Structures are given as C-alpha cells and as structure tokens.
Amino acid sequence: MTRYIFVTGGVVSSLGKGIASASLAAILEARGLKVTMLKLDPYINVDPGTMSPFQHGEVFVTHDGAETDLDLGHYERFIRTTMTQNNNFTTGRVYEHVLRKERRGDYLGATIQVIPHITDEIKRRIIKGAGDADVALVEIGGTVGDIESQPFLEAIRQLRFEVGARRAMLMHLTLVPYIATAGETKTKPTQHSVKELRSIGLQPDVLVCRSDHPIDISSRRKIAQFTNVEERAVIALEDADTIYKIPGILHSQGLDDFVVERFGLQCGGADLSEWDKVVDAKLNPEHEVTIAMVGKYMELLDAYKSLIEAMSHAGITNRTKVNLRYIDSEDIENQGTGLLEGVDAILVPGGFGLRGVEGKITAVQFARENKVPYLGICLGMQVAVIEFARNVLGWKDANSTEFDRTSAHAVVGLITEWEDATGAVETRTESSDLGGTMRLGAQDCQLEAGSLVHDCYRKDVIVERHRHRYEVNNNLLPQLIEAGLKISGRSGDGALVEVVEAPDHPWFVACQFHPEFTSTPRDGHPLFSGFVKAALAQHQKNS
C-alpha cells in the first residue's frame, strides 16, 4: 500500500518545497523504492497554460500533454518516474469537476459544500495520482495560512486520519532567518508557523528548516521542544551552491532513515553515487563557454526554468561551465547586435506574441551569417524559418500569421484542423480558446540520416514534447528547401516540419519541440550536449 508524505511550507513562499521534496524522493528511489510526486496548486486557474510567464513562470509539459506547474520539472529531473496529468491539479480543476457533476445531477440534489464534496474530490485525485507507488510525496502549493490552501490542508488532514499514522506523515518547510545585528538564527517564525498548522489539526512529523546560515544544535533542539517534533526530525537545510547537493545533505542528516522507519518499509541503503558524480562535474568544470540566451521573459527567469537547467546539464555532461548571457530580444531591437558580440553560441527559446520577435529574428541572422552555433526551440525554430525566408529567399515580408495575418509569404501558420483522441476532426481558428488548444505532449519525430540533429541523438526516430499552435507552412516549403533550408526532422507521419538546419553552417539546429522537458542532471540531453560541444569548438576557434 502507498505511503504518503505531505509537504507544506510556512513563514514565506519560495523556500524550495519542490526541491526539498524531489531530493527526498530521489533518496528513497535510490533505496529501491517506487516513488511518485504530486503538486497541488491552490489557484483557481484550471491549469497554468494561459497564465502569464511573468507571474507563474514556466509551464511544464508532461509526456501525456498536460500543462502543469514548473515543480513537476524538478520532480522529473530528480527521480526516474515520468509525471502525467494526474500528478498536478488546481483548485480550478477540482471545482470544475465538482460543478460538472452537480450539473449532471450526480449529487442527487445535495447542497454542494467545501466539506465534504471539494475535499473528497481532492482526496480522490491524490489517491489516483499516487497510483501503486511505494511512497507518494504530495506538495501543497502556497504557504500555510493562505486562504486559498485551506481546502487542501483540510483534505490532507482527513486523508492522514483515514489511512493512519503508519501510512501518512507531514513534512513542513520553514524559514529560520539569520539576524546579522544579533549574530544568531531565530526560531520564532518556525514556532509560529507550526502553531498555525496545529490550529487546523495538522501536527508536522518532520521540519525542514531553511536558512542562509548554519543552524546550530541548540536551535534545532529548541525548535523540537516547542513544536512537538523529534529532534532527529528537525532537518537543517542551508543554502547550497548547487541544488543537486540537496539529496546528499538530507541523507547525511538521516531524513530517509526516519521516513523508512516510520513507515516500516523494507528496502536497502541509499546509493547516491550518481548524484556525487553530478555534483563533482558541476563544481569542477574543465572548460568554460558563454552562450547568449535571447528571450522575451527575462524579468522572470523561472519562465525558462527547464531550459536553464538543461543548459546546466549539458555543462555537466561536457565538464564545462556554461555562462548564460540573458538578453532581452527587445534590447536587440533597440541597441543592435553588439549585445551578441563575443558569445560562443546563441540560444533562442520559445514564446508567444509579437513583442520582441524582430529582435529574435535579428539574433538568428547574426548567428547564421557569422557562423555562430545556434539552437532554436519552438518559436526559436519559427523565427529561424522566417529569417531564412527574408534574407536568403528574398521574401522581405515573410512572417508568421501569429504576427501578421496579411503577409503574402506566411511561412509559419496556424493549424486549423486537428483530430482528437476519438478521430473526430476539431476546427480551430484565431479566435478559439487559448486554453487546451495547442499541440501538446510527446510526439514521434523522424530524423534525417547525416544531419546534425541525427548526429546528436544517434537515432532515426525520437520522442519529444510539444507546446505550440503554429507550424511551418507546407505550401511554401518547396521554395524554402530549394533555397537551401534543410529539413532534418519531420513528425511521425511526415506531415509536419520538426527540425530545420541552415546550409553551410558549422552548427545551426532549430526544433519545433521542447527538448528541455526531458533533460536530466544524471543523463543530460543529446541535443543540448551537442550544442555545448559546438559552443566549445567555437570558443577554442576564437581563443
């Protein structure tokens, strides 16, 4: 039977519940247990698919096409379990389902209330998401005390009681601030946070205390005394120079032993040698490169969380320190390509909308004409095709219908007809709902033998995840190919362009899919690894 570890946060947000949870999951997995993770988001949006990147950060796409919280990206990077649509749900999703049942008459005229109807639905989804895992870690978003999270906390209180203490425990993350003028860490915020939890019927079993300074044994003993938590279960988690140290830090304090003993699990010891290798490669690089990342959401780098991590993973696999130079594409429009001088490679990620697109196109032109290694992802591929059409083929008005519906040379356009899972044709237009109307999830891609991308993957068919509405216009494809654009990847049925490469260029690859969603620190990703190798070659050439 599945054991549950519920993870909450207190005092302030952004303490790193996702990283701490994923790190504990990684240790339990290293002990031979089957582990899964869930993220429960208290906001009322149905999913984060239509939320602003400046507010929410990245939308992580699962293998089965769910648009989810970026924490699921952390989960997949730390454990081998593949996340699905069942591993993340929101208040909006829960209420939507309950209201749909009410409209159908499933509740037989009952008055619909938060308790029991909403909490029952939350519990049902937790159990479904946990599946047949030995241990399921369930992270509740937000901070204890937020009004939005109350139904979730009540649901886990009920579920904890229903399954019993041998199958459920609560891990609470808090902040232990360091007061410089006093020269000591303060435990009072943690005490009050636990008091808040206990007021709603939740007693934590484990406290993970975050701090930017060491937490001495006397402070941990004081926290244990005032919170009714065993002293061995008060874990000090100081800021680390890489998040991939966290599994080792938690293991060194015996957190996994505490969990295994509490649940009565039979398993072996933790083999963290893979993580030791990751940390060593991360902290002891042999080379260094600088790569320009030209995007439009640079005010909140969490909008590119998986991509930034994927570049770090590529650095790990190549024993290379990857310095990312973050450049807003609008700055290129205003200040020119001088911002790109001296970099070893250029990366253009995905995005939506007209703002900053011309700056991205200019960055592509700079990379192509100056033979600088280039990797384009999603919109980064679409602007590569637009730039090629404008400056090689001579179609100066070439564009995407996303940005200019009147262009005579719309080399990128909206797919207007899709088949749903039943085979029925669904028609979409520019005015269709934004939510849930994209090409989403894992898709097959056929690679052209002898291409750069094939050299990276060393496979004829790959599977990568998508999140987009627009595709290269097949009606104009013959002219693009005739002008030299190389189509090195196509969809499984051969109908859609997935990867393009520029002619007469040392390394220029642009893909419609999002490879960053499948990159991990232990395995890296072949496309990003190849990109960093190309940047290394460029760096050595320029040295």
Curated annotation (Swiss-Prot):
Function statement: Catalyzes the ATP-dependent amination of UTP to CTP with either L-glutamine or ammonia as the source of nitrogen. Regulates intracellular CTP levels through interactions with the four ribonucleotide triphosphates.
Source taxon at top rank: Bacteria
Additional observations: CTPSs have evolved a hybrid strategy for distinguishing between UTP and CTP. The overlapping regions of the product feedback inhibitory and substrate sites recognize a common feature in both compounds, the triphosphate moiety. To differentiate isosteric substrate and product pyrimidine rings, an additional pocket far from the expected kinase/ligase catalytic site, specifically recognizes the cytosine and ribose portions of the product inhibitor.
List of residues binding CTP: 13, 146-148, 186-191, 222
HAMAP family, sorted: PyrG
Origin organism lineage: Bacteria, Pseudomonadati, Pseudomonadota, Gammaproteobacteria, Pseudomonadales
Top-level class of the enzyme under EC nomenclature: ligase
BP terms from Gene Ontology: 'de novo' CTP biosynthetic process; pyrimidine nucleobase biosynthetic process
Protein name per UniProt: CTP synthase
GO cellular component: cytosol
Binding sites annotated in the UniProt record for ATP: 14-19, 71
Keywords: ATP-binding, Glutamine amidotransferase, Ligase, Magnesium, Metal-binding, Nucleotide-binding, Pyrimidine biosynthesis
Subunit structure of this chain's protein: Homotetramer.
